[in-house]
Each structure stands twice: as structure tokens, then as C-alpha cells.
Amino acid sequence: MLCQQMIRTTAKRSSNIMTRPIIMKRSVHFKDGVYENIPFKVKGRKTPYALSHFGFFAIGFAVPFVACYVQLKKSGAF
């Protein structure tokens, strides 16, 4: 008896889910196209993007070497 009741309630719930719209319409539209799907500006910049890109990674790469130099300088190795 309990099993049949559970089957009925499950069938009712699944039929309710199937009647809902699957795709929701959004009122916001973003521009599509080349360079529009990234959160920063690539074309039409004052400085080339490559300069900021490689500069960022160069600073990150240099930090451990600068830290080692400072620590060795403090210890009197240089």
C-alpha cells in the first residue's frame, strides 16, 4: 500500500516537472564576436596587451629570485 502511494506521488511530481518550460528566456544580451568573450580589452589599447601580459608573468617569475638576493644580502653572503 505504501509503495503504491509513493509511486503515485512520484508520478505526479514528475508530470509537474515535465510541464515546466525547460529553457528560461533572459532579458540580458551581451555582444557576441571576436574579443567580446574575455573580461579585458585586447584591441585598441594604449599599451600593447603583450606588454602587460608578459610583464605580469615576469614580475611573478622574478619575485623568488629577488627574495633570495635580499636574504643573502642580509646574511652577508654578498
UniProtKB/Swiss-Prot annotation:
One of its GO terms (molecular function) is oxidoreductase activity. Component of the cytochrome c oxidase, the last enzyme in the mitochondrial electron transport chain which drives oxidative phosphorylation. The respiratory chain contains 3 multisubunit complexes succinate dehydrogenase (complex II, CII), ubiquinol-cytochrome c oxidoreductase (cytochrome b-c1 complex, complex III, CIII) and cytochrome c oxidase (complex IV, CIV), that cooperate to transfer electrons derived from NADH and succinate to molecular oxygen, creating an electrochemical gradient over the inner membrane that drives transmembrane transport and the ATP synthase. Residues 28-51 are mitochondrial matrix. Belongs to the cytochrome c oxidase VIIc family. The keyword Mitochondrion applies. Residues 1-27 form a transit peptide. The chain crosses the membrane at residues 52-73. This is Cytochrome c oxidase subunit 8, mitochondrial. One of its GO terms (cellular component) is mitochondrial inner membrane. It is found in: Mitochondrion inner membrane. It comes from Saccharomyces cerevisiae (strain ATCC 204508 / S288c) (Baker's yeast). Pathway: Energy metabolism; oxidative phosphorylation.
